[in-house]
């Protein structure tokens, strides 16, 4: 049994695989557990309180009502792997995964690994996406994807454009208003929820209607997926300008959907990620390179995905939610293992 990825999804898978008594191995390209979190922007704070950020079996340390930073999360993941003695092989990048005669082979930069079942747990963040027209910006305009942003000092003084505004983009834009003249370009207006309401975290209130536990195949889940709210951020109350979608760029000038233009000295592309599954030599992706699955179970027996955005619910890619999907997949893996064992005799 091979688990590719040792972030929060892979570690949660390892926890439940321990309970199946199946032999398994986790591999990860990073030099240490929690590396992806440590390389995020310095001011990152989770929008879920610590009490909602626990993987199965280990509470998140500290005040249950505080909002952890990126280093807190990285440290927690390392402690989690130690606590449950999970078998993690680091600095091992999988460059190809293919199948032959019912066995999967993961080609890595440290040799080949073979398994009868594979969990692909590389997470919701694939390859950073920047629109193709960004190449038409003048070389003098500093461009950063949000994955490469660390702090305001990276950017030259003056006017900054933040393109795209999920929760990370909103946090970055808020931070930059203290040091720069900030414009935010929004593809669409997003619903906003306060971080706290009447003295309680918004997630405490949402529990009453199980808002973030609605599956993607329900009407409310489908609506939420298309209207993911910003939490704890009110951009209109900040010292920044809000523009519509960016449609193009030439030189130092950016064009917006409403026909207006403006020039900037720097652009932060908070435009998300794309698949990053080019190494998968298996029929488990659609024509856009996205995983084909039903709650992580693919049409190829023995191949599973874990940690995807909206894999089952809004919480699927969150620290406090991935465990439910991991438990579900561990049960399916155990069932498939026994079916195969019975068939093979």
What are the residue ranges of the model-derived segments?
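Flavin (primarily FAD) cofactor-binding/catalytic cores of flavoenzymes
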Residues: 1-30, 34-36, 65-167, 171-345
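Short, flexible, mixed-charge acidic loops at enzyme active sites
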Residues: 42-54, 199-201
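Glycine-rich flavin
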Residues: 49-64, 212-213
């Amino acid at each position: 049994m091979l688990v590719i990825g040792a972030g929060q999804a892979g570690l949660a898978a390892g926890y439940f695989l321990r309970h199946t008594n199946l032999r398994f191995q986790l591999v990860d390209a990073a030099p240490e557990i929690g590396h992806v979190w440590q390389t995020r922007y310095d001011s990152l704070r989770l929008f879920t309180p610590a009490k909602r950020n626990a993987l199965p079996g280990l509470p998140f340390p500290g005040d249950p009502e505080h909002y952890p930073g990126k280093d807190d999360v990285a440290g927690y993941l390392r402690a989690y792997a130690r606590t449950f003695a999970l078998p993690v092989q680091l600095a091992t990048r999988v460059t190809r995964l293919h199948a032959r005669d019912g066995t999967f082979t993961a080609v890595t930069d440290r040799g080949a690994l073979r398994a009868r079942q594979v969990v692909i747990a590389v997470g919701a963040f694939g390859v950073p996406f920047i629109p193709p027209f960004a190449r038409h910006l003048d070389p003098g305009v500093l461009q950063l994807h949000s994955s490469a942003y660390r702090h305001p000092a990276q950017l030259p003084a003056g006017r900054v454009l933040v393109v795209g505004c999920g929760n990370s983009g909103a946090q970055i834009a808020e931070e930059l208003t203290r040091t720069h003249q900030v414009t935010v370009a929004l593809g669409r207006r997003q619903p906003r929820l306060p971080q706290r309401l009447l003295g309680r975290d918004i997630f405490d209130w949402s529990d009453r209607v199980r808002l973030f536990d609605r599956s993607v195949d329900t009407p409310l889940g489908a609506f939420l997926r298309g209207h993911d709210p910003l939490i704890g951020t009110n951009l209109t109350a900040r010292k920044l300008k809000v523009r519509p979608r960016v449609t193009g760029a030439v030189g130092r000038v950016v064009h917006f959907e409403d026909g207006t233009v403006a020039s900037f000295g720097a652009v932060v592309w908070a435009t998300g990620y794309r698949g990053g599954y080019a190494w998968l030599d298996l029929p488990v992706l659609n024509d856009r390179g996205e995983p084909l699955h039903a709650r992580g179970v693919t049409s190829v027996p023995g191949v599973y995905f874990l940690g995807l955005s909206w894999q089952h619910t809004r919480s699927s890619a969150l620290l406090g939610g991935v465990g439910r999907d991991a438990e579900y997949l561990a049960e399916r893996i155990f069932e498939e293992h026994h079916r195969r064992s019975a068939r093979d005799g």
